[in-house]
């Protein structure tokens, strides 16, 4: 059974290891995953997280959801769910599961994502850049189509 752990601004993300807290609870034990906000309930906690795939079900670029609350920035009142690639090549162990974003999409984020250019970020998402997008951070509004530097 999978469970969710709360991380990055307090939003639930799918976890493949560790122990469960209240964010992993569900109303019945018949559900196989709580990766989606709609399946997170208040009872029947699972003690461990064993699921390694399937967390991306129902994800997509865009699409607003009312789950969660406004982050510390207070800039947005809704959240966008998406599937992010596995960014472990850049040193983070976060799984490629559904997450709830804390920022609006940008070209340096998931739409043009390539796993080899991922950078870890906050709020459970990853900043992912095209192969030769040489912006130093994902807060830049424009991505470079080609590299002027030998290493991106």
From Swiss-Prot:
Pfam families documented for this protein: Keratin_B2 (PF01500)
Swiss-Prot/TrEMBL Sequence repeat ranges: 27-36, 37-46, 47-56
InterPro entries: KAP (IPR002494)
Modified residues (N-acetylalanine): 2
Tagged with keyword Acetylation: yes
A single Gene Ontology CC term: keratin filament
Record keywords: Acetylation, Keratin, Repeat
Keyword Repeat found: yes
Other comments on record: The source of this keratin is lincoln wool.
Function of the molecule: The keratin products of mammalian epidermal derivatives such as wool and hair consist of microfibrils embedded in a rigid matrix of other proteins. The matrix proteins include the high-sulfur and high-tyrosine keratins, having molecular weights of 6-20 kDa, whereas the microfibrils contain the larger, low-sulfur keratins (40-56 kDa).
Protein name according to UniProt: Keratin, high-sulfur matrix protein, B2C
Originating organism: Ovis aries (Sheep)
